[in-house]
From Swiss-Prot:
Keyword Hydrolase in record: yes
Protein encoded by which gene: sixA-A
Organism in which the protein naturally occurs: Haemophilus influenzae (strain ATCC 51907 / DSM 11121 / KW20 / Rd)
Molecular functions (GO terms): protein histidine phosphatase activity
GO CC field: cytoplasm
SUPFAM superfamilies: Phosphoglycerate mutase-like
Organism lineage: Bacteria, Pseudomonadati, Pseudomonadota, Gammaproteobacteria, Pasteurellales
Keyword line: Hydrolase, Protein phosphatase
InterPro entries per UniProt: His_Pase_superF_clade-1, His_PPase_superfam, Mito_Ser/Thr_phosphatase, SixA
Name by which UniProt lists this protein: Phosphohistidine phosphatase SixA homolog
Hydrolase found in the keyword field: yes
Residues annotated as transmembrane: none
């Protein structure tokens, strides 16, 4: 199973609650550009698309998915689910358990849009070692997972963007 783990784009510092924080203009652009990169990257693989997308219920993660979906010309619209299990304080073991269910259902590729510290914990759990990736906003890591162990195939940090 190809697993793409993405941290949300740059978010506002202040909001009524952590859950309600929106992406900044910069964060929206990061997410869109990473979506374009991911679409192009998938076209070079046998995968060509994503089977399932898991998105945190937090506003900034949903806005990140929206931008990625825009980059995919809305083709991901019917493939995503909002899951409470991938909020910042979710548990990597629960995520792995759910990935096992998806793998058993025949899902070959998954995008997870979530938060620190969980994104790093998921990588560490799948990889079986300390997470070597710095998850800056909108970073995407790709892991190939066989159900027991995984290897990190690559990671893509968001490019530097100059806003006018």
């Amino acid at each position: 199973m190809n697993i793409f783990i993405m941290r949300h784009g740059e978010a506002e510092v202040m909001a009524n609650s952590d859950k309600a924080r929106h992406l900044t203009v910069y964060g929206s652009k990061q997410a869109f550009l990473q979506g374009q990169w991911l679409k192009q990257h998938l076209s070079t693989l046998v995968i060509n698309s994503l089977d399932r997308i898991l998105v945190s219920p937090y506003v900034r993660a949903q806005e990140t998915f929206h931008q990625v979906n825009q980059a995919f010309d809305l083709e991901l619209e019917n493939k995503f689910e909002i899951w409470e299990g991938i909020t910042p304080y979710g548990h990597a073991h629960s995520v792995i358990d759910y990935l096992e269910v998806l793998k058993d259902e025949g899902v070959k590729s998954v995008l997870i849009v979530s938060h620190l510290p969980l994104v790093g914990e998921i990588v560490a759990e799948l990889y079986g070692k300390r997470n070597p990736i710095s998850f800056y906003p909108a970073t995407i890591a790709q892991l190939l997972w066989d159900g027991n162990k995984s290897e990190i195939l690559m990671h893509q940090a968001s490019p530097v963007i100059y806003l006018k």
